[in-house]
Amino acid sequence: MIKFSATLLATLIAASVNAATVDLRIMETTDLHSNMMDFDYYKDTATEKFGLVRTASLIHAARNEVKNSVLVDNGDLIQGSPLGDYMAAKGLKDGDVHPVYKALNTLDYAVGNLGNHEFNYGLDYLHNALAGAKFPYVNANIIDVKTQKPLFTPYLIKETSVIDKDGNPQTLKIGYIGFVPPQIMIWDKANLSGKVTVNDITETARKYVPEMREKGADIVVVIAHSGLSADPYHSMAENSVYYLSEVPGVDAIMFGHAHAVFPGKDFADIKGADIAKGTLNGIPAVMPGMWGDHLGVVDLVLNNDSGKWQVTQAKAEARPIYDAAAKKSLAAEDSKLVGILKADHDATREFVSKPIGKSADNMYSYLALVQDDPTVQVVNNAQKAYVEHFIQGDPDLAKLPVLSAAAPFKVGGRKNDPASFVEVEKGQLTFRNAADLYLYPNTLVVVKASGKEVKEWLECSAGQFNQIDIHSNKPQSLINWDGFRTYNFDVIDGVNYQIDVSQPARYDGECQMVNPQAERIKNLTFNGKPVDPNATFLVATNNYRAYGGKFAGTGDSHIAFASPDENRAVLAAWIGAESKRAGEIHPAADNNWRLAPIHSDTALDIRFETSPGDKAAAFIKAKGQYPMKKVAVDDIGFAIYQVDLSK
């Protein structure tokens, strides 16, 4: 007993002598989407609102504030802007370094994680791109089909030299682990099927985090390309961060994917979220928006009084590069990065400036959420023409009527960017304009759907709208921004229909039925006659929608054929062909859908948000199908319009 006490005392004395406190800052970029420059290639103009060359200034400043810091990237890096398109079209030869890594390699990243869009161009292209990174990558939940082992390094434990508060050198063993949404197997099935599988994020964390601790990790940093949702836990969830915060042994969560900002007011209602501290169930967590518009910062205080390092204090914040309220830049350009990127930037501008045709009219998406719209119409026209030509030699498919589904991709972001609208001017069109009209490198896929499934597909799309109370004279918001993503608001061309927003939504934002008795889709017709529920249609869409199985009429069993061509390339080719045939395209909407008139004895005050600009105001005045009046500008900068749906 005396021997034991002496040993214990010696241990305590040693721990006391070696006790130290370390401040550690962890910084994060995420969802850069190849926006390296502070430049909007779609508008061919500089911007202060996004771009890594400005985020870099925040990185330098944040580093200079502290003794100890590390920087991580959370994926969706190589795709998403014309720079990414240019590089994918050009290809990567042995030894080529992708421009995103020319930039990131100068900023001393400790580690990177993969996002879902890393797989858009296939595994070979991804591996060639990653070869240019001078920092390691982690991902724990992608499994190689052949080896049944992780395709990438699941986690890393990096010995990191730090300085404690007394000025003494210390060594921290920082563990990093990365995750990607399992849905990549749906979204990029053509690139991944038969090559990899993907495991559940939370279950994978529960497997590896204890192992990381056993192998000596002093702290564990989770880098999750996944969003935050308080929905009940279910396996293979896309947005798993809430449940990652409950995994024992996790010290910090750097997350993304949702293009939102945490800590932020949009997440104030989530149980366990402390917006002031930037914690989730007590764990510091940060999600720094998109395109480099924020830098994520987690600050930890670590102490080893007990003989092992423990987090004693923690906080997180997302630092913006632009003050939207004051309309003021908060970050200057990093001139070194600008110089490094100049050649690729210039080549990208040249790439997107190649003429493809002409347009007889302007194409703006200011009203795309409230009425049929030219920016969606031209996509549907192109997809429909492509499929009708493609099936001519197939006797089984050629007899089926062709519809086309497309959604507005640029209608204010996630109600976080009043400048994010399609603005294509009449006259000469370039590839830049095609990329503005169709943002993503999706491929065209055709599904077979019954008339009943077409209606249910549209019922899910109609979840884009809030229900209007016909007895209330208070202001009512028309657009369901919080519960529905605008890229899921499919307009199906080839049929005619109305959407009755006085009725409750039949489906939620995930196309799960919530009101079985509700019906918003009215007067659904094909060639002037009610759609036969048992009729079969071909519906042109994209690989995300077709393989997703979320909407009625989609999923593997419904695939009629998968095109090798990108929807955007189909659009560009159609613009070229139509311009050659007719001299120019005529992008007017055919008005195959509209919001059904609402009859009420109450003077309704229905409102929607759109661009605040004079160009938008003029367009709305000239093209609005319903009486509309601008009544305010909200705190984000969106114009608020009152719309009369009584007619």
Curated annotation (Swiss-Prot):
Amino-acid positions noted as binding a divalent metal cation 1 in the UniProt annotation, renumbered to this chain: 31, 33, 76, 259
Transmembrane feature ranges: none
Subcellular location: Periplasm
EC number: 3.1.3.6, 3.1.4.16
Catalysis: reaction(s): a nucleoside 2',3'-cyclic phosphate + H2O = a nucleoside 3'-phosphate + H(+); a ribonucleoside 3'-phosphate + H2O = a ribonucleoside + phosphate
Main location: periplasm
GO cellular component, one term: outer membrane-bounded periplasmic space
GO MF terms, alphabetically ordered: 2',3'-cyclic-nucleotide 2'-phosphodiesterase activity; 3'-nucleotidase activity; metal ion binding; nucleotide binding
Tagged with keyword Metal-binding: yes
Gene3D superfamilies: 3.60.21.10, 5'-Nucleotidase, C-terminal domain
BP GO annotations: nucleotide catabolic process
InterPro entries, per the entry: 5'-Nucleotdase_C, 5'-Nucleotdase_C_sf, 5'-Nucleotdase_CS, 5_nucleotidase/apyrase, Calcineurin-like_PHP_ApaH, CpdB_N, Cyc_nuc_PDE_nucleotidase, Metallo-depent_PP-like
Keywords, sorted A to Z: Hydrolase, Metal-binding, Multifunctional enzyme, Nucleotide-binding, Periplasm, Signal
Residues reported to bind a divalent metal cation 2: 76, 116, 225, 257
Cofactor requirements of the protein: a divalent metal cation
Family from the record: Belongs to the 5'-nucleotidase family.
Remarks, miscellaneous: Two kinetically distinguishable active sites for the two substrates (2',3'-cyclic nucleotides and 3'-nucleotides) have been identified.
Protein name: 2',3'-cyclic-nucleotide 2'-phosphodiesterase/3'-nucleotidase
Organism in which the protein naturally occurs: Salmonella typhimurium (strain LT2 / SGSC1412 / ATCC 700720)
